[in-house]
Amino acid sequence: MTRIKRGYIARRRIKKFRLFASSFLNAHSRLTRTITQQKIRALVSSDRDRNNKKRKFRSLWITRINAVIREEGVSYSYKNFIYAQYKIQLLINRKILAQIAILNRNFFYMIFNEIRKEADLKEYIRIN
């Protein structure tokens, strides 16, 4: 078998890896094998954490909405609020509801009371 000299192609590839890993600490930014391993690990972690970020933000929005609802003092929960919202087909997503709850509480309470009234009215009509 003939010998293949990789020359500048290998250097170019390794240089790309080194630029990616330039901010890593110690051997993780200096040794070629550990650079490639750390690159794979970093990319896997970034992919995983991107999905975790979505999950954490959703739980944050739910917590904020629930806190404002329970602050009203009524024995009403987030679960009942979202159920009533879907029952009257008012589709405001959790992100927007959480922002309204934080920035403009009076407006959120207006929405909350409307949803409660509509849901109670529909429930009353269905019973009778």
From Swiss-Prot:
The keyword Ribosomal protein applies. Gene3D superfamilies: 6.10.160.10, Ribosomal protein L20. One of its GO terms (molecular function) is structural constituent of ribosome. It comes from the Eukaryota. It is found in: Plastid. GO terms for biological process: translation. The keyword Plastid applies. One of its GO terms (cellular component) is ribosome. Its main location: plastid. Keywords: Plastid, Ribonucleoprotein, Ribosomal protein, RNA-binding, rRNA-binding. SUPFAM superfamilies: Ribosomal protein L20. Binds directly to 23S ribosomal RNA and is necessary for the in vitro assembly process of the 50S ribosomal subunit. It is not involved in the protein synthesizing functions of that subunit. Belongs to the bacterial ribosomal protein bL20 family. This is Large ribosomal subunit protein bL20c. It comes from Epifagus virginiana (Beechdrops).
